[in-house]
Amino acid sequence: MKIDKRLMVIVAIATLFRMIPFRLKYLVGSDPYFHLAYIEEALKAGEWFNFFTYAGGPWGLQVRLFHPLGLWATPAYIYKLFSFLGISLYTAFRVTPVIFGVLTVVFFYLSLKKLYNRDVAFIVGLFLGVNYGHIFRSMANYYRGDNYMLFWYSVALLGIALGLKTRSKYRYLFYLLPGIATGFASAFWQAYYPIFVFVLAGGLLLGVYAYLKSPKLFLDSILIVLSTGLGVLIANILGDKVGYGMLGYTDWMGKKVAETFGLEFGFIKDAYLLIHVKYLLPLSLVFLGFLIITKKLNPKIKVGVLVGGSILAFIVMLVKFPALKDLSTGFGTFREVPISETLPPTLDDLWRAYNIAIFLAALYILRLRKIRSGDAILLGYVITSLWMLRYWTRFLFTAAPAVAFLSGIGVYELTRRIKENKIRITSLGVVILLSSAFSLGEVYSVKPFMNENWEKALIFIRENSNENDIVLTWWDWGHFVTYYARRSPVAQGSPNSGVAGYYLGLVDNGWAQSLGVDYVIVSLYDILKFEAIVDTAKLSRKWENISRADYGVDFLKLTESTGSILRFDSQYSTLIVKEGNIRVILSGKVVYPREAIIESNGRIKNLKYPARSGVYVYVNLDYGYAILANEKAWETNLLRLFTQRTGENYELVYSDGGFVKVFRFVHPNVVFRGNKFILTGNGTGLGLYGYLDNGTLVFKKWYSVKNMQEFELPNNLNGSVVVRYVYTQGKIVLDRGIVRVKN
């Protein structure tokens, strides 16, 4: 077997770029920490259990309602496969994204080699190998599920390429591969659905190509479209085994989308799969049938028929099925949620992801004079992925190969017109080096959110709290709590308006008590997200009228230190500290704060002034920063706790002096130890709800515990593996949580 040296070069470059973050001690982002925590606990338990008690506090989290099992099983089996080499699970987990990211590049290379030629494949492979938009979610230390979807699409594309270009009477069998790939993609990520659209769009555009230029390819087009039906069948079968996607029949989003489209779950138990089978697949076949019927028309008339028919079909589809207009945005999912991933990309986002490839993509126009069947297939993916990119920054990754295809093919078309071989090679080298340099800078600039400050604080909680304790922290850090503290956070993975309201002081301690909160984390990182906290609180109708303008918070860095004089600056204000005398310069006007808190060497010094400025100041001398706030922000729970102006319900148990602080929330509490509930406070009732691992409620009973200090778990819980408990005094909830029952 002859070694493809060009492919080896691409593999080496793609691997090198994606392994750069491996040098980092911590994982990138926050989601990977949840995934790794679950894998570790599952391997420890010896089974892929469903009910995870270290997440989703105080209720617990059913992981089968989160992602399909393949997302967690893959790194685990890679670890088991290579454990004989002495690699740890942590290492295996960190390199898994690289493995599938590089494999994606490889399969795209092989596909383009079939659809075009080895030169096109090589240039596109180089562009994709150094494309930061693709690197970001396929690099070491950053484990994300969409990496698998693009991998399976690259497999599907290879199957289509083999079907189109193989000279054999059995070539049509290759069209089983896109069906298998789309189906298997469902086992690895909850939002795998775009792969169906990519394959379907490719089949439809191949049908258009067949209509205009090569009628013999109609059968290929139909088989590609039908392959997605096989994918639906496989995805539906796998769903019963490893869990459905985010539009599954047990998920609230799946129920909502099904209701919107007037669908009922039956044999097919996923809303998107139902939409695909009931609407997208039949409509696509009708469209292809229309093209086949009119294929013998005059070529000029055919163009008019195609354009007019497409417009008419699009209008009819939107009138008859108006909800389909939201298909590209996940049916409106997260439309109002303040997450950067679900906002449209900015020009800066596009430049960071693709750099010069954005401009080089325009060169694809040189290819339009001689469109071939391979172009039709690729354009199906390119058009749909770029359309998705209009809506969400998240799709910078999904569209990365599309940009690489356009720019790579465009550069090939340009350079092949250059007759001088040295100039052609030099030009290509300069372009690739430029793109590589920009991407290299972006990869090296990647920094984890996790750091030693967080790690020490969370390990403290793990070592000094009870297993059933609940932790309140901002949702961005919730997965950190699950991994390092092995405790259940109230919010993680998605915005929580209740937690935002708590930090802003819009709810009282009774709210936290009703959720069983035992520890509250406040940090400088939360204060830096103050505007996001306000925006998240506004998601609740109760607080939709609050405004960022109501809460004034400014972060200032130490910029000058001369003797006893310290100067702190931000874009908007200046703070001068001199021997306890503090002045604030706002818009050129000098004012004095009403209250100032100075933290240094673990001590808090509170200074009050007879000023009426409405300005409040926190100064941290150890870490060299200051916080400026107006009265409304100053009196929020977040700043009251961070500046240690707490009431009797909060006890500071950990502080690093200025980054992360942990408070124990003092309230009537339940501790689960040795199959016994140890009760504190004057509670009168204890409700127990037992569940099987699949989430079925099999036990429910209330007990009177008045004047009791402990309560032993009943022996017969009807096979329950986890128990949710509620500790009450009359109708008031004193504590709440979830425990795993030990045999």
From Swiss-Prot:
Domain of life: Archaea
Membrane disposition: Multi-pass membrane protein
UniProt entry keywords in alphabetical sequence: Cell membrane, Glycosyltransferase, Magnesium, Manganese, Membrane, Metal-binding, Transferase, Transmembrane, Transmembrane helix
Signal peptide positions on this chain: none
Cofactor(s) in the UniProt record: Mn(2+); Mg(2+)
Residues that, per the record, bind a glycophospholipid: 394
Motif (DK motif): 526-533
Pathway it works in: Protein modification; protein glycosylation
Cytoplasmic side: 1-7, 113-119, 166-170, 213-216, 294-302, 367-373, 416-424
Motif mapping: TIXE motif: 333-336
Span(s) of short sequence motif DXD motif 1: 29-31
Transmembrane regions listed in the UniProt entry: 8-28, 92-112, 120-140, 145-165, 171-191, 192-212, 217-237, 273-293, 303-323, 346-366, 374-391, 395-415, 425-445
GO MF entry, a single one: oligosaccharyl transferase activity
Residues covered by region (Interacts with target acceptor peptide in protein substrate): 474-476
Family annotation (InterPro entries): Oligo_trans_STT3, STT3-PglB_core
An example Gene Ontology CC term for this record: plasma membrane
PANTHER family referenced in this protein's UniProt entry, alphabetically: DOLICHYL-DIPHOSPHOOLIGOSACCHARIDE--PROTEIN GLYCOSYLTRANSFERASE SUBUNIT (PTHR13872), DOLICHYL-DIPHOSPHOOLIGOSACCHARIDE--PROTEIN GLYCOSYLTRANSFERASE SUBUNIT STT3B (PTHR13872:SF1)
Record function comment: Oligosaccharyl transferase (OST) that catalyzes the initial transfer of a defined glycan (ManNAcXyl(2)GlcAMan(2)GalNAc in P.furiosus) from the lipid carrier dolichol-monophosphate to an asparagine residue within an Asn-X-Ser/Thr consensus motif in nascent polypeptide chains, the first step in protein N-glycosylation.
Protein name: Dolichyl-phosphooligosaccharide-protein glycotransferase 2
Species annotation: Pyrococcus furiosus (strain ATCC 43587 / DSM 3638 / JCM 8422 / Vc1)
